[in-house]
C-alpha cells in the first residue's frame, strides 16, 4: 500500500474536547500532499464559551465563528474529505477525542477511523530535547509555520509522518507504526460512552 493518509488538527474554544472551533485537514497520497481544507466551527451549544487562555493560543474568538456551521453540519464534510483514510495527528488522542466528544455533544454518531500519533512516531524517529509539534516538524524539515493554526499544524503533522516513513523505509502507515513500535488507535465509540 502507498503512504496514504489524512492529517488532522483541531483548535478548541475551551478545555472541553467538544468545543472544536477550527479544523485543518491535509490529504496525502503516495507521500505527497494532494489536498488541504480548513474551516471554522461553531462549537455545540453548552460547549461554546471561548476561554481567554484558548483565544490567546489560537486567536479565534466567538465573533469569528458566529456565521460558521455547527459541528453536526460540518461533520459530513470532514468525513467526505478523509474518506476511509488512516488519520494522523500530533498527540492524536486529543484530536480523536475532539471528534468523539463533539459528535456526542451534537448527538450525532462519531465516525470510525484508525489513527496514528505523529508524536509517538517522532519519539521513535528523532533524538530531540522536546517533541512538541514545532520542534518535531523542524526535525522533519518543515519550518516557519503558524503553530496553533489548525491547517498549519496538520501540514506539520503530515510532514513528520512523510519524513519518518522515509527514514524508516515504511511504505504505508501500518508499516510505519510497526517499525516505530507505535500503537495504531481506533476511533468509533458509541455516543453514550463519550458522555459518561
Language model segments and positions:
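Acidic, divalent-metal-coordinating active-site segment for phosphoryl/phosphodiester hydrolysis
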Residues: 149-164
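Conserved beta-strand -> loop -> alpha-helix junction used to position metal-binding or nucleic-acid-contacting
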Residues: 109-122
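Conserved non-catalytic scaffold segment of RNase H-like nuclease domains
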Residues: 1-101, 105-106, 110-112, 127-130, ...
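Ser/Thr-centric signal marking residues that sit
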Residues: 10-12, 118, 157
